[in-house]
Amino acid sequence: MANVHVINHPLVQHKLTIIRDKNTGTKAFRELVDEVATLMAYEITRDMELEDIQVETPLQTTTAKTLTGKKLGVVPILRAGLGMQDGILKLIPAAKVGHVGLYRDHDTLEPVEYFVKLPSDVEERLFIVVDPMLATGGSAIMAIDCLKKRGARNMKFMCLVAAPEGVKALQEAHPDVEIYVAGLDEKLDENGYIRPGLGDAGDRLFGTK
């Protein structure tokens, strides 16, 4: 699939397996989601631009590399996306954080927006939009719509697991947005849940039902 990157690193896949396990408790689930987000952030920033600068080491002056180009932003889709936020910030502590609040209507399966708060300089940033699951694609599409309406021009989407239906929908709605996923799953079931999936990420992160 164009613009879809499946992160097959052994550590990512090992941790994702434990995340999927129904016997993994809330504390371990939360810690593992955080760890996988950090590992995926390493991959998602692989194409960031560098420039040469002069640095004084204790022994001499040398030419070294430093990040340049777009400033970064992280936008978790509330509430489950919060579980991935800090893992990314460990690698990119200077990134600004915005939030998009959406919930899925369990009857229509459509997302409903209830909160949006973004940095003021959205047009200058590359945003990493995060949500543990990409099911129908509705929430991701609406979140990216929200950013674009407010001036954002550069975005990537990161999730732990995705259904092919959601990937297709997001690609069709926003072909300019690259998708990074740890596990590309089999399908959506008749209730709109990813199979095999990992259950309800929000409930498992926060210990709710």
Curated annotation (Swiss-Prot):
Cofactors required: Mg(2+)
Cofactor note: Binds 1 Mg(2+) ion per subunit. The magnesium is bound as Mg-PRPP.
The enzyme's E.C. designation: 2.4.2.9
Pathway membership, UniProt: Pyrimidine metabolism; UMP biosynthesis via salvage pathway; UMP from uracil: step 1/1
Record comment: activity regulation: Allosterically activated by GTP.
A GO molecular function held by the record: GTP binding
Taxonomic superkingdom: Bacteria
Keywords annotated in UniProt: Allosteric enzyme, Glycosyltransferase, GTP-binding, Magnesium, Nucleotide-binding, Transferase
Catalytic activity: UMP + diphosphate = 5-phospho-alpha-D-ribose 1-diphosphate + uracil
InterPro entries: PRibTrfase_dom, PRTase-like, Upp_B, UPRTase/APRTase, Ura_phspho_trans
Binding-site residues for 5-phospho-alpha-D-ribose 1-diphosphate, renumbered to this chain: R79, R104, D131, P132, M133, L134, A135, T136, G137, G138, S139, D200
An individual GO BP term: UMP salvage
PANTHER family on file: ADENINE PHOSPHORIBOSYLTRANSFERASE, URACIL PHOSPHORIBOSYLTRANSFERASE, CHLOROPLASTIC
Task of the protein: Catalyzes the conversion of uracil and 5-phospho-alpha-D-ribose 1-diphosphate (PRPP) to UMP and diphosphate.
Protein family (similarity comment): Belongs to the UPRTase family.
NCBIfam families listed in its UniProt record: PRK00129.1, upp
Protein name: Uracil phosphoribosyltransferase
Species in which this protein is naturally found: Listeria innocua serovar 6a (strain ATCC BAA-680 / CLIP 11262)
